[in-house]
């Protein structure tokens, strides 16, 4: 059963397989399943509160949000904007951990009000009115317009992130310079349809499906194993792309330095090389970083190298 169809009753009616891996999102499908297919061994890959005692295999949202928050904070942001999660259990979990990790980082989470929840609470629609809300935020911060902002927006999934990007583009809001956008799922179909590549948490959906198949086999082998347990599947990594490729700093010196470090850290540069490239003193560079960024120039160089090494090790 799919979250993209009105219901999946016809699929279930003709289903003659031994078991089922499903994402329950439609109330008609849930009602039919609970009446007609309740004895069919099934693994649910969602968190819908349907009242059926099914084993579940779902994304580890705590680790998803750890990756998301670390990435946004590493870009220099001290606040994250998002929308209300509504009653969607998956989004509620992500929002809860978003708040928890931002609090640990001494950051803030702000909720934008102009989003609409579908009756099933499975989809959250980004409204054009969100631009007006961003304009009000800019005015409250004594800025000329939205393009003077430097904020990060977290979307609960890539579909929502794509909606946000299209809305921002429609109103000529700069991405990522004014609004950086981060999604979840690393959905290549969504990303290839965007003219700005989307940074996203790769939830390893293929691995989740494999784990769900293993759990289904356990239920098929021993029906007593079906006791409503929830198995969490860790995300693979965060995939940085253009939509967050910026640094939230109120200093052209620091911004230029960070971009140059990002382009040259692998060549053996030192903090003194950064200062020389920018034609400023080392003391001036250190002072600018101290006032406007979370790391010193030397720490940033070492950090970029550490991340690069970690990525290489992951690929070997």
Question: Which residues fall in each region the model found?
Answer:
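Bacterial carbohydrate/catabolite-sensing allosteric modules
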Residues: 1-22, 29-271, 275-277, 282, ...
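Terminal helix-turn-helix DNA-binding modules in bacterial transcription factors
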Residues: 291-316
């Amino acid at each position: 059963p799919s979250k993209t169809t009105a219901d999946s009753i016809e699929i279930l009616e003709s289903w003659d397989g031994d078991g089922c891996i499903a994402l329950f999102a439609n109330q008609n499908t849930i009602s039919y399943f609970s009446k007609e297919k309740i004895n069919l061994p099934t693994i649910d890959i969602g968190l819908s509160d349907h009242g059926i005692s099914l084993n579940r295999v779902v994304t580890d949202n705590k680790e998803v949000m750890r990756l998301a928050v670390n990435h946004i904070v590493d870009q220099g942001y001290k606040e994250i904007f998002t929308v209300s999660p509504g009653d969607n259990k998956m989004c509620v979990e992500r929002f809860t951990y978003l708040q928890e990790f931002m609090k640990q980082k001494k950051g803030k989470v702000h909720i934008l009000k102009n989003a609409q929840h579908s009756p099933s609470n499975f989809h959250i629609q980004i409204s054009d009115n969100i631009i007006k809300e961003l304009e009000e935020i800019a005015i409250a911060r004594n800025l000329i317009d939205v393009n003077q902002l430097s904020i990060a927006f977290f979307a609960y999934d890539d579909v929502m992130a794509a909606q946000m990007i299209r809305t921002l583009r429609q109103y000529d809001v700069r991405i990522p310079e004014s609004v950086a956008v981060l999604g979840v799922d690393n959905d290549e179909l969504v990303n290839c349809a965007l003219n700005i590549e989307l940074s996203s948490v790769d939830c390893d959906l293929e691995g989740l499906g494999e784990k769900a198949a293993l759990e289904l086999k356990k239920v098929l082998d021993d029906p007593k194993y079906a006791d409503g347990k929830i198995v969490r599947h860790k995300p693979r990594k965060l995939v940085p792309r253009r939509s967050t490729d910026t640094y939230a700093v109120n200093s052209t010196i620091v911004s230029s330095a960070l971009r140059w470090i990002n382009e040259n850290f692998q060549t053996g540069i030192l903090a003194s090389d950064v200062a020389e490239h920018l034609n400023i003193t080392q003391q001036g560079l250190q002072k600018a970083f101290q006032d406007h960024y979370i790391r010193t120039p030397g720490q940033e160089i070492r950090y970029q190298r550490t991340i690069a090494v970690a990525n290489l090790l992951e690929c070997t």
